[in-house]
Every structure is written in structure tokens, then in C-alpha cells.
């Protein structure tokens, strides 16, 4: 059976927003996820074949921490030997993507949002785009959750032509999170 690895920066977010996709993938492949140990850990363990705890400093910009994450991704890929890797969120997309590219493992990147580093501009935007470019160039596909993010990144030249896909329906499962009218009174909860 094929092996798929999924890299993300939050176990709860991966479970809450990707469990339907993971369940479908499980019908066709063994699924390993590498995520930090936080929300929904036990549920994620029941859903997949293997969960590897891999800390991700989601908001930090420490190059020592990020280089450690890159090395951990390299080691994990060498151990798991996946046939395909899916990455979610900026650090797994960049460092996981680069690790996959160096290991010649096919991978697809899901850009869930641009984040403040790109949206705020300046030197940090240039730095992040410089990291994104080689990470995305090796990807088999670059998935976006909205056309605006795709257009913004495509305009910078970091997205490989013909490999970008805007997903329709990458949002929440309305059976798990039913529609509720917006409250006009009091704080939003």
C-alpha cells in the first residue's frame, strides 16, 4: 500500500479541517502525520496510521529553530519513506517542501493563507518569498484556498506555472459546524 505523509503546524487544526480528506486518503494509503502535540491529539491518533510529534514554532522567526525543523523533516522523511507528502501552513510548506525536494519525494503544498509576513510587506516578505520559491518550484501541485492568495503569490513569480489550483470547498464541514446566524448583540463567541 502507498504511504502518504502530512505535515502541519497544529494537530487540532489538521484534525478539525482535514479529517474528511484524511479519512478518504486512508482508504487508499497508509497515512502518517507529523505535527506538534496539541489539541485533538488522541482523535488524530485514531484517524491515521502513525502520528509523529514534531514541534513547530508557528509564529517564531528564529533561524536556529527553523533549521532544526528542516533537519527533523529530513530525518522523518528518511524514516517514513512516503510516496507522497502533503504540507499545510507556511513552515511545513517551506521547510517540509525543501526537505521533500532534496529527498526527491513528490509533494503538494496547500497554502491556507498568506500570513502577516507577506501581507505586511517589507524585508520579511522578501525573505519569506525567497524561501517559498525553491519550496514551491519542486511541488507537484500548489493548492490555494482562494484566488486572491494565488494571484498575489503568482504575481511574485514564486508559483510554478500550471501547477496552481484554487480549491473550491476547502472550508469547514457544515455537518460538524452547522450554520449559525451572526449575532447582532454582544461579543462574537
Set out the residue ranges of the language-model regions.
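Donor nucleotide-sugar binding/catalytic pocket of nucleotide-sugar-dependent glycosyltransferases
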Residues: 52-53, 133, 137-179, 183
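N-terminal strand-loop element at the rim of the active site
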Residues: 8-65, 152, 163-166
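Active-site proximal beta-strand in glycosyltransferases
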Residues: 2-8, 100-117, 132, 143
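Nucleotide-sugar donor-binding and catalytic loop/hinge architecture
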Residues: 1-2, 177-189
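Nucleotide-sugar donor phosphate/pyrophosphate-binding loop at the beta->alpha transition
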Residues: 15-17, 64-71, 106, 116-138
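Short beta-strand scaffold positions
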Residues: 35, 86-87, 144-145
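Short His-centered aromatic/hydrophobic patch
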Residues: 87-93, 111
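Alpha-helix capping/helix-boundary segments
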Residues: 39-40, 91-92, 148-150
Amino acid at each position: 500500500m502507498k504511504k502518504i505523509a502530512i505535515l502541519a503546524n497544529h494537530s487540532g487544526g489538521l484534525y478539525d479541517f482535514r479529517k474528511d480528506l484524511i479519512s478518504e486518503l486512508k482508504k487508499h494509503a497508509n497515512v502518517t502525520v507529523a505535527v506538534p502535540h496539541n489539541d485533538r491529539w488522541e482523535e488524530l491518533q485514531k484517524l491515521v496510521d502513525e502520528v509523529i510529534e514534531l514541534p513547530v514554532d508557528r509564529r517564531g522567526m528564529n533561524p536556529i529553530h527553523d533549521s532544526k525543523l528542516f533537519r527533523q523533516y529530513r530525518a522523518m522523511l528518511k524514516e517514513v519513506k512516503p510516496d507522497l507528502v502533503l504540507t499545510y501552513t507556511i513552515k511545513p510548506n517551506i521547510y517540509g517542501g525543501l526537505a521533500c525536494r532534496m529527498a526527491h519525494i513528490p509533494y503538494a503544498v496547500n497554502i491556507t493563507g498568506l500570513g502577516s509576513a507577506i501581507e505586511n510587506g517589507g524585508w520579511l516578505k522578501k525573505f519569506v518569498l525567497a524561501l517559498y520559491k525553491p519550496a514551491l518550484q519542486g511541488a507537484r501541485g500548489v493548492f490555494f484556498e482562494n484566488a486572491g492568495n494565488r494571484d498575489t503569490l503568482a504575481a511574485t513569480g514564486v508559483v510554478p506555472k500550471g501547477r496552481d489550483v484554487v480549491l473550491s470547498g476547502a472550508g469547514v464541514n457544515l455537518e460538524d459546524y452547522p450554520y449559525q446566524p451572526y449575532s447582532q448583540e454582544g461579543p462574537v463567541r
